[in-house]
Amino acid sequence: MTYFMLFLGLCFVLGGLAVASNPSPYYGVVGLVLASVVGCGWLMSLGMSFVSLVLFMVYLGGMLVVFVYSVSLAADPFPEAWGDWRVVGYGVSFIVVLAAGAVVGGLVGCWDSGVITVDSVGMLSVRLDFSGVAMFYSCGVGMFLVAGWGLLLTLFVVLELVRGLSCGAIRAV
């Protein structure tokens, strides 16, 4: 199980690396899907199946729509691939930064904490991921409002960017 968790962590880092060093939006979608599937699988293997399912639906439902808009806006006739030297240089530099962060984190002593999986204190009648979702709705009302306004603003920005020269969704009244 330890090797499987390490493999999922490595795949998650590689998916994030693919999103960060994407040469064109076409390949960024592949990295995002890889990172979201592996991250949700990681959460599911830790015992948080509900949160994993919710995040999977949000990532694949919401973020892929954003990438569809960016692909339609940045349609290149000759997109750069991951094999180009510039993109390989980005990837190597990101890996060097991650390795340096791991070394510094190990020297400082940031790796002493463990992972709390399903139960926080022994056998409980409520799983940790369900109580966490309840805490989102009880204590996180302000953050939900800020996130909702941010998503509404993002929707209007995307609609303005996509409309081009024609009369789009937002018109002067």
UniProtKB/Swiss-Prot annotation:
Transmembrane segments: 1-21, 27-47, 48-68, 87-107, 139-159
Membrane topology: Multi-pass membrane protein
Superkingdom field: Eukaryota
The keyword rRNA-binding appears for this protein: no
Entry keyword annotation includes Transmembrane helix: yes
EC class of the enzyme, as a word: translocase
E.C. number: 7.1.1.2
Pfam families documented for this protein: Oxidored_q3 (PF00499)
Record field: catalytic activity: a ubiquinone + NADH + 5 H(+)(in) = a ubiquinol + NAD(+) + 4 H(+)(out)
Span of the signal peptide: none
Compartment list: Mitochondrion membrane
Family designation: Belongs to the complex I subunit 6 family.
Function description: Core subunit of the mitochondrial membrane respiratory chain NADH dehydrogenase (Complex I) that is believed to belong to the minimal assembly required for catalysis. Complex I functions in the transfer of electrons from NADH to the respiratory chain. The immediate electron acceptor for the enzyme is believed to be ubiquinone.
Protein name, per record: NADH-ubiquinone oxidoreductase chain 6
Source species of the chain: Synthliboramphus antiquus
